[in-house]
Design a protein with these regions (language model features):
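A short, exposed loop/beta-hairpin motif centered on an aromatic-Gly-Thr core
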Residues: 22-34
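Hydrophobic pocket/interface hotspot
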Residues: 18, 35, 104
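N-terminal segment of the canonical double-stranded RNA-binding domain
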Residues: 1-14, 19, 41
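Short amphipathic alpha-helices within nucleic acid-binding modules
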Residues: 33-38, 130, 134
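Secondary-structure transition/turn motif
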Residues: 19-23, 127-129
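Short, charged, surface-exposed hinge/linker loops at domain edges
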Residues: 1-4, 38-109, 114-121, 145-146
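Arg/Lys-rich, glycine/proline-spaced intrinsically disordered segments
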Residues: 138-144
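Short helix-start
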Residues: 113-138
């Protein structure tokens, strides 16, 4: 499905900022090209979140008047289906993380990994596995502070 939203781009203190008119949040970039690319990435992540959790996307509005004196509007378009969200089975996530499938289930229960359902099957998002790999917590219990 295609998702189209209007963003306002304006100058912040150090970066150009892009805020969507119909959602909370936003993004930034060092120049106009980068802020447009970041707005596309931001919208993609928002749509993925809504698709994974069966949340409705807000109604898009167009022809909005910029809120900032130097603001200009851009249109951001993403094409995305729930089937295209990067994901792993629990077994694949376990292999990536170097743990057992049971440990992956524990990490999901502890909200350390994000999951979603697709066609009656539960999947682990690649983003949450990548984030966990980037953290690389050490094995065992944390040491007690003296």
């Amino acid at each position: 499905m295609v998702y189209v939203y209007e963003f306002e781009v304006y100058k912040g203190e150090k970066f150009l900022l892009a805020d969507p008119y119909d959602m909370l949040g936003g993004t930034q970039g060092v120049d106009f090209k980068e802020v447009c690319e970041m707005a596309g990435d931001w919208l993609k992540m928002e749509v993925e979140h809504c698709l994974m959790h069966d949340l409705p996307m807000p109604e898009a509005t167009f022809g909005n008047k910029p809120k900032h004196a130097d603001g200009q509007n851009i249109i951001v378009v993403v094409q995305l289906e729930k089937e295209n969200i990067p994901r792993y089975t629990f077994a694949e996530a376990a292999r990536q993380l170097g743990v057992t499938r049971g440990r992956v289930s524990q990490m999901v229960d502890a909200c350390l990994l994000e999951t979603f359902e697709l066609d009656g099957r539960k999947w682990v998002t690649k983003y949450s596995v990548d984030a966990r790999l980037a953290e690389r917590p050490k094995a065992g219990r944390p040491r007690k502070k003296k």
